[in-house]
Amino acid sequence: MAQRSRVTLPQLQAMKERGERITMVTAYDYPSSLLADRAGMDMILVGDSLGMVVLGYSSTVPVTMDEMIHHTKAVVRANPAALVVADLPFLSYQTSVPDAVYNAGRLIKEGGADAVKLEGGQAVVPTVRAIVNAGIPVMGHLGLTPQSAVQLGGFRVQGRSEAEGEKIAADAAALVEAGVFALVLECVPADLARRITAALPVPTIGIGAGPDCDGQVLVYHDLLGLFDRFRPKFVKQYANLAEATVAALEKYRDEVRQGKFPDQEHSFK
């Protein structure tokens, strides 16, 4: 693939206005960032989902700022053309607005991210506004918000009732007014996502939100079949790399035990 120019916020906005779909995938280290960018992704999300698919936690809640910065730095070292968005982890922005601005700044200054993402609706509007006023682009996240999944009754679809749907739509409008450049809609009915997308001036990025969002995001390990602890309904698995990886490792194990590796081709004279 030819070298691309860096993706910018105005370009993403123009894509929405032209009806061009935006592509986004998570990455958590140098190799995944390199491959995602080589595939031509518009955005890379260094998600706190790394807690589950990389660090082995049962949820995103234990992920720390230092862990997010560590992984964001690795992603940025690949020098991707894609816009890099990093998650603000649990308790990095809920404690106070100054804490939120400081931690968002760390992801930009220390991690090298282009933008940050946080979860929540009208309750986080003052936080979003303060971070944006500090010169840091913010992506919102509504619907199923994993950091508060217990409060929401677990990992389930949000916005099915009329009242829930109206609240999500109102939250979306409030976040846009506060200055978000884009909005993730996770696990909401497709019709609700379509209506919100049509009403908002900024791009929506869906994950389990149907086909009518302005873009889509999936977890790297999910779409490549690298994480098999569970697979949400909305995940389409484009490869089964876990199976291929185990097969390769088994072949290596067998060749070592049988004395077939290393052979002359892989040895020095």
UniProtKB/Swiss-Prot annotation:
Keyword Protease in annotation: no
Annotated catalysed reactions: 3-methyl-2-oxobutanoate + (6R)-5,10-methylene-5,6,7,8-tetrahydrofolate + H2O = 2-dehydropantoate + (6S)-5,6,7,8-tetrahydrofolate
Metabolic or biological pathway, per its Swiss-Prot or TrEMBL entry: Cofactor biosynthesis; (R)-pantothenate biosynthesis; (R)-pantoate from 3-methyl-2-oxobutanoate: step 1/2
Any one GO cellular component localisation term in the record: cytoplasm
Pfam family, one: Pantoate_transf
Residues the record lists as binding Mg(2+): 48, 87, 119
Obligatory cofactor(s): Mg(2+)
EC number: 2.1.2.11
InterPro entries: Pantoate_hydroxy_MeTrfase, Pyrv/PenolPyrv_kinase-like_dom, Pyrv_kinase-like_dom_sf
Binding site for 3-methyl-2-oxobutanoate: 48-49, 87, 117
Catalytic residues of the enzyme: 186
GO MF annotations in UniProt: 3-methyl-2-oxobutanoate hydroxymethyltransferase activity; magnesium ion binding
Cellular localization per UniProt: Cytoplasm
Keyword entries, A-Z: Cytoplasm, Magnesium, Metal-binding, Pantothenate biosynthesis, Transferase
Cofactor: binding details: Binds 1 Mg(2+) ion per subunit.
Domain of life according to the entry: Bacteria
Family: Belongs to the PanB family.
Function: Catalyzes the reversible reaction in which hydroxymethyl group from 5,10-methylenetetrahydrofolate is transferred onto alpha-ketoisovalerate to form ketopantoate.
Subunit description: Homodecamer; pentamer of dimers.
Protein name: 3-methyl-2-oxobutanoate hydroxymethyltransferase
Gene name of this polypeptide: panB
